[in-house]
Each structure stands twice: as structure tokens, then as C-alpha cells.
């Protein structure tokens, strides 16, 4: 079944050229894929369209059987509850605790304090940070801060998880650890799309790759896997 479908989607800002031009692709439910391309290729714009931070100039976007191009403004918050987003710079609140950062989407959505606390602990447990709820993000390493960002993105159990350069500021070892987390969410049925410049990481992972070139989808291809189907990133030690 299809989770995401773009049909002849274009996005133009002002009188300039198209940031995205005639984009067509599908992502299956539970699929893991990468979105890559040069700086300015349109990766962030494509993700913003899926989050309804932007609207397309032309074409149709379907996410979880909902047509985003005709969605009313009042429906947007409900759509965003289905989507988790991870940013390169974490976008954490450094004057709040880790618990407060992760709980923020639940508070906005109106969850009770008891249910929010349960979900926050479960999300932190899933990224290996359970027991650190009372600490401040500034006390954490870059990799740990990114884990907090991932916990916040999945705390409301989204069907679709988007990440924009989530390993851009991390060394290769930490990058693989973060990718390992994304794979775990994909293995329980979450559709994952990761925008990244890290071609070496993409090639090691061996998943489908969507390649943007000056706003056009250059190709959609599967990499030959360099790992067995049940081998996780970071399992090689020799």
C-alpha cells in the first residue's frame, strides 16, 4: 500500500524558476528511502510540501490517503500529527528539560499529563535516553541531542517520519547509530524518508534513493545492498 504519492508536483517561488518541477514518485507504507541531491536541489522544499509547511504550485500530493493539495487549513494540525520531523540542528528548547522538549507535541495535541508522561518515557526508551528526562539538552553531546530530536518526532507515533540532514553535524560512527534508530522505526511499520548529502552513508545502507537535480527527480533507484537483509548498520567490527 502507498503512504506517499507525488503526481506531477511543481513548486515555484515568486517569479523565479521552479524549485521543484514535475515530481512523480511513490513511497510504500513501511518503506525506508533516502532523498539526495546537491545543495539547492529542492530536498527541503519537497519535505516542506509533505509537512504542509508549503503548498505545491501544481500537481497532487497524497499522504496516508489524504490529498494535501485540497486539505483545508483547519485540517493541517491533524495531518501533522501523522508526520514526525527530525532536523539537522535539533531545534531543541535549551531552557527546558529533555522531558519538556519531547512532551511538547503532545501538549499541543491536548494529551493528558499522565498519557503524555507515558509516551515521553516510551519515546526516550526507544532512543536509549530513558532516565535522562530531568536533564537539560545543553548537557548532552551532539549525538544525544539528535536522539532527543528523534524522540520528539516519534512521541506521537507518526505513520511517516521525515528527516532533513539528521547526521550532518555528526561523525561517521554517530551517524550510523542514528541511522540504526531510523531503521528500528521502519521495522515496526513507519515510513521513513531521509534527506542527506552523505553519499557514503547511503551506499553503505543500501536502500532506495531518490535523486533530485535542479528541482527535477533525476532518478529513483535501489542501491545494491552491501549488508545482509538482517544486518544492522554498525554491526561490522572487523
Stretches found by the model and what they are:
Residues 161-164:
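Catalytic Walker B motif of ABC-type/P-loop ATPase nucleotide-binding domains
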Residues 136-140, 144-146:
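Conserved ABC ATPase signature
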Residues 51:
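Helix-to-loop junction immediately C-terminal to a conserved catalytic motif
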Residues 59-67:
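Conserved ABC transporter NBD signature motif
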Residues 155-159:
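A short, proline-enriched helix->beta-strand linker immediately N-terminal to the Walker B motif
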Residues 14, 68-84, 187:
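ABC ATPase NBD coupling module
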Residues 96-103:
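Short coil-to-helix segment of the ABC ATPase nucleotide-binding domain corresponding to the Q-loop/switch region
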Amino acid at each position: 500500500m502507498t503512504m506517499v504519492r507525488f503526481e506531477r508536483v511543481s513548486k515555484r517561488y515568486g517569479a523565479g524558476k521552479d524549485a521543484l518541477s514535475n515530481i512523480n514518485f511513490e513511497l510504500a507504507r513501511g518503506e525506508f528511502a533516502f532523498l539526495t541531491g546537491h545543495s539547492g536541489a529542492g530536498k527541503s522544499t519537497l519535505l516542506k510540501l509533505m509537512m504542509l509547511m508549503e503548498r505545491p504550485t501544481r500537481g497532487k500530493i497524497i499522504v496516508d490517503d489524504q490529498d494535501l493539495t485540497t486539505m483545508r487549513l483547519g485540517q493541517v494540525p491533524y495531518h501533522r500529527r501523522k508526520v514526525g520531523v527530525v532536523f539537522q540542528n535539533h531545534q531543541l528548547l535549551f531552557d527546558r528539560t529533555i522531558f519538556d522538549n519531547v512532551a511538547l507535541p503532545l501538549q499541543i495535541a491536548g494529551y493528558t499529563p499522565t498519557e503524555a508522561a507515558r509516551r515521553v518515557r516510551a519515546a526516550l526508551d526507544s532512543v536509549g535516553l530513558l532516565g535522562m528526562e530531568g536533564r537539560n539538552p545543553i548537557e548532552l553531546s551532539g549525538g544525544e541531542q539528535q536522539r532527543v530530536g528523534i524522540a520528539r518526532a516519534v512521541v506521537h507515533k507518526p505513520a511517516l517520519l521525515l528527516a532533513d540532514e539528521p547526521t550532518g553535524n555528526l561523525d561517521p560512527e554517530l551517524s550510523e547509530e542514528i541511522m540504526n534508530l531510523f531503521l528500528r522505526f521502519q521495522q515496526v511499520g513507519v515510513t521513513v524518508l531521509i534527506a542527506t548529502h552523505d553519499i557514503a552513508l547511503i551506499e553503505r545502507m543500501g536502500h532506495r534513493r531518490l535523486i533530485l537535480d535542479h528541482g527535477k527527480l533525476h532518478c529513483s533507484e535501489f542501491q545494491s545492498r552491501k549488508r545482509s537483509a538482517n544486518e544492522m548498520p554498525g554491526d561490522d567490527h572487523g
